[in-house]
A protein has these predicted regions:
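AMP-forming adenylation/ATP pyrophosphatase catalytic core
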Residues: 1-139
Length: 139
């Protein structure tokens, strides 16, 4: 079953009753792609000077969870810390997709918000290799 929604002058056809998919946690085990419960996909690749610094993944697990509220994010030391909720509200992401939006943790600390950035603590820079994480939304 599907329903039609309107957001910022665009029409969306979305699955009904996605509430059952709300909370999820996935542990990354080296896959290049992970299909999420809402149909979107995370893509992973190594890159020099980009992504989550690989040194943090030696001793801790990379976890993927949906936003649950109260998370904060600081991708740049010269800018203030932001709530994930505020970050997603300021984007053009439709409201019904925000609660399913994946965020990336190293251990229990927020490390990245796909397509938005890496928290300053976890950034790979210069000649350091990192794990790039990109989200492809379901259509």
């Amino acid at each position: 079953d599907f329903e039609i929604r309107l957001y910022i002058d665009e029409i969306y056809i979305v699955k009904k009753n996605q509430k059952g998919q709300k909370n999820y946690e996935i542990i990354w085990q080296g896959e290049s792609k992970i299909l999420l419960p809402n149909g979107s996909q995370l893509n992973f690749k190594n890159g020099k000077g980009r992504g989550i610094n690989l040194k943090f993944l030696r001793d801790q697990k990379l976890k993927i969870r949906n936003r649950q509220g109260g998370e904060f994010f600081k991708p740049d030391s010269r800018r203030p810390t932001k709530k994930i909720k505020q970050l997603l509200q300021e984007s053009d992401l439709p409201p019904w997709e925000r609660e399913f939006f994946p965020i990336i943790f190293v251990g229990d600390e927020l490390a990245a918000v796909p397509n938005f950035g890496i928290d300053q603590k976890y950034q790979a820079d210069g000649q350091v290799y990192g794990l790039e994480v990109n989200l492809t939304q379901s259509k």
